[in-house]
Design a protein with these regions (language model features):
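Conserved class I S-adenosyl-L-methionine
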Residues: 2-11
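Glycine-rich SAM-binding Motif I of class I
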Residues: 13-17
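Conserved SAM/SAH-binding beta-strand->alpha-helix loop
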Residues: 35
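Conserved SAM-binding strand-loop segment of SAM-dependent methyltransferases
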Residues: 50-61
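A short SAM/SAH-binding and catalytic strip from SAM-dependent methyltransferases
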Residues: 72-87
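A short glycine-rich, Lys/Arg-flanked "PGG" loop and its adjoining helix->strand segment in the class I
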Residues: 89-101
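Conserved beta-strand signature within the Rossmann-like core of class I S-adenosyl-L-methionine
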Residues: 101-111
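Class I S-adenosyl-L-methionine
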Residues: 126-164
Length: 164
C-alpha cells in the first residue's frame, strides 16, 4: 500500500533516488532541502518518477508548516554532529511528532564520530559534540532503536532507526 515519507536534508539526492525507486506506486514523498541549487536537481529527479507524488520544499525543516497528515517514515540526512544540541533536540522532536503511531525515523551518522570527538581538544566544541551524541543515544534507547552499518558509503555510515 502507498505510504507517506518525509526526507529531510536531501542534498544532491542519493537517498531521494533510492526512495523513488523503492516506494510503492501512489506513495507521497515530501523532500525538505534548504539549498535552492539542490532543490532544482531534486525536482528534476522527482519528475522521472511520476508514479510517486513528490513535493520538494526549498527550506529548513523548522520552516515547514506541520502537516495534518503524518508520515509513515522519515529519513534524515542532516549532519547532527555539527549542530548545536538544542537544535538537534528540537529537530528530532519535530520529526517524531510528525510520525504516525508505529512510524519510523531513520538518520545517518558517520562511523568514526566517536573517534573524532575523542581527538577534539577539550572545550566548547567537544562538549557540544558529546551532548549531541548523548541525546541521540538516549532517544535511540528510549525508542528501542536499531543500528546497521553502510560500509559501501564513503566514509562508512551508520543508519539508526527508531519506531514510535
Amino acid at each position: 500500500p502507498p505510504v507517506r515519507v518525509l526526507e529531510v536534508g536531501a542534498g544532491t539526492g542519493p537517498v531521494t533516488r533510492e526512495l523513488l525507486l523503492r516506494l510503492p506506486r501512489g506513495s507521497q514523498l515530501v523532500v525538505v532541502e534548504p539549498s535552492r541549487g539542490f532543490t532544482k536537481r531534486l525536482r528534476a529527479l522527482a519528475d522521472t518518477h511520476p508514479e510517486i507524488k513528490t513535493t520538494v520544499l526549498a527550506c529548513r525543516l523548522d520552516e515547514v508548516e506541520p502537516s495534518r497528515h503524518r508520515f509513515h517514515h522519515i529519513v534524515s540526512s542532516l549532519p547532527f554532529a555539527i549542530f548545536h544540541p538544542d537544535q538537534v533536540r528540537q529537530t528530532v522532536e519535530q520529526m517524531l511528532n510528525q510520525l504516525v503511531d508505529g512510524g519510523t525515523l531513520s538518520y545517518f551518522a558517520y562511523r568514526g564520530a566517536q573517534l573524532r570527538i575523542a581527538i577534539t581538544p577539550r572545550g566548547p566544541s567537544r562538549n557540544q559534540q558529546e551532548a549531541v551524541q548523548t541525546y541521540l543515544r538516549q532517544v535511540h534507547h528510549q525508542h528501542h532503536g536499531t543500528t546497521r552499518s553502510a560500509w559501501v558509503n564513503l566514509p562508512p555510515a551508520v543508519v539508526r532507526t527508531i519506531r514510535t
